[in-house]
Each structure stands twice: as structure tokens, then as C-alpha cells.
Regions:
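Short-chain dehydrogenase/reductase
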Residues: 91, 109, 125-126
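Flexible, glycine/small-residue-enriched loop-and-beta-strand segment within the central core
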Residues: 16-17, 37-103, 130, 136-138
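HATPase_c (GHKL) ATP-binding subdomain of two-component histidine kinases
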Residues: 118, 127, 133-134
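C-terminal segments of enzyme domains that contribute to small-molecule binding surfaces
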Residues: 7, 79-93, 97, 131-180
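Membrane-proximal basic amphipathic "stem/tether" segments
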Residues: 1-25
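Structural motif
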Residues: 32, 87-88, 103-106, 120-123
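Beta-rich strand-turn-strand
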Residues: 94-110, 114-118
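Short, charged, low-hydrophobicity "junction" segments
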Residues: 5-7, 29-45
């Protein structure tokens, strides 16, 4: 019966409670006006601090420890942990992994799918595995400003608007360079 009740509770949290509310319940410290879409908070969520105006997108994973099992072969009682801090106005892209001891600096952007193994300075864009510097957020803003449609619309209004736009108003990425 206990397993059944735990299953019901898990379904309740995932269907009826927002990811942000669940994170706060688990002990994640979250600032004001954040958009939290993940539920992957490691086994020590109380070691994670998120500032104000932060966006953490789908399936981002936070890791407050790891690798201890290899060391336990030599030191059976080994365990090590690291706090994670996401500072104000940061953005963490979908499916990224934030490792123990990392700070994401104010106004920084972590590209989707990144593995962040070192702290990120304020105001930069990083991406990749492991995450590497791409550009400043100021450069990112300047490059993308021409694509700004400047609207907050309903789903239907957005669809109609986007389908009416010309091709040059959409973001287009260059091809990956090859050696051929």
C-alpha cells in the first residue's frame, strides 16, 4: 500500500504542482519572477540557489555531487558535494547539465544541451560539452535584435503572425563548416 501511495503522490506533484512550487518544496532557493520548467534537482536540492528573473527551461539537470563511487573503492566513506548558484537574469537552455560547484553569472546564457563543468562569468553565452565561451550576451543581443518581433500574443495570434512573416524575418543558421 505504501508504494501505491507514493506513486499517487508522485503523479500529483507532476500533474498538479508547478515545477517551481515543487522545487521550493524540495528546498531550492528561488528568487522573484523566475520561469522554472525542470524537475531535475539532484538529491540535494537545498544546495541550489536561483536568483531573480532566471529562466530554467525543460529537462535541465542539476548535479550537486558525483563520481564518488569510484573513490569509495579506496575510501569507503567518501562523499563530496558542491553548491550551485544561478545568478539574476541568467538563462539555462533545455537539456543542459549544471555540475557541482558551478556558478552561472548574472545575465549569462547557457545554450541548450550544454554540460557546464566550470563557473560561467557574468554576461556571456556558453555552450557545448564541455561548455565553452561563445560570445558576450551584448554580442548575442546585437546579432539577434533584427529578428525581434516584439510581441506577446495569444497562441492563435502568434501562429497567424508568424505564418504571415517573410523568410528573412526568421533566424537562419549557417551550415557547419566541413573539410571538403
Amino acid at each position: 500500500m505504501n508504494h501505491f501511495l507514493k506513486s499517487i503522490a508522485k503523479i500529483y506533484w507532476h500533474l498538479l504542482v508547478s515545477p517551481e512550487k515543487e522545487a521550493r518544496h524540495l528546498g531550492v532557493k528561488i528568487g522573484q519572477d523566475c520561469l522554472i520548467s525542470t524537475r531535475n534537482w539532484s538529491s540535494e536540492p537545498y544546495l541550489i540557489t536561483i536568483g531573480n528573473h532566471v529562466q530554467v527551461t525543460d529537462n535541465v539537470s542539476f548535479h550537486t555531487h558525483g563520481g564518488g563511487n569510484v573513490i569509495r573503492r579506496f575510501e569507503p566513506n567518501f562523499d563530496a558535494f558542491g553548491k550551485i548558484e544561478i545568478q539574476d537574469w541568467a538563462y539555462i537552455g533545455a537539456w543542459s547539465h549544471i555540475m557541482a560547484g558551478v556558478t552561472i553569472g548574472e545575465g549569462s546564457l547557457v545554450a541548450a544541451g550544454s554540460v557546464v563543468t566550470k563557473s560561467v562569468p557574468p554576461g556571456v553565452v556558453v555552450g557545448g560539452n564541455p561548455a565553452r565561451y561563445i560570445c558576450t550576451t551584448e554580442d548575442f543581443f546585437k546579432r539577434n535584435l533584427k529578428y525581434n518581433v516584439g510581441r506577446k500574443l495569444t497562441r492563435k495570434e502568434k501562429k497567424d503572425f508568424l505564418l504571415s512573416m517573410s523568410e528573412d524575418q526568421f533566424i537562419r543558421k549557417p551550415y557547419i563548416k566541413t573539410n571538403e
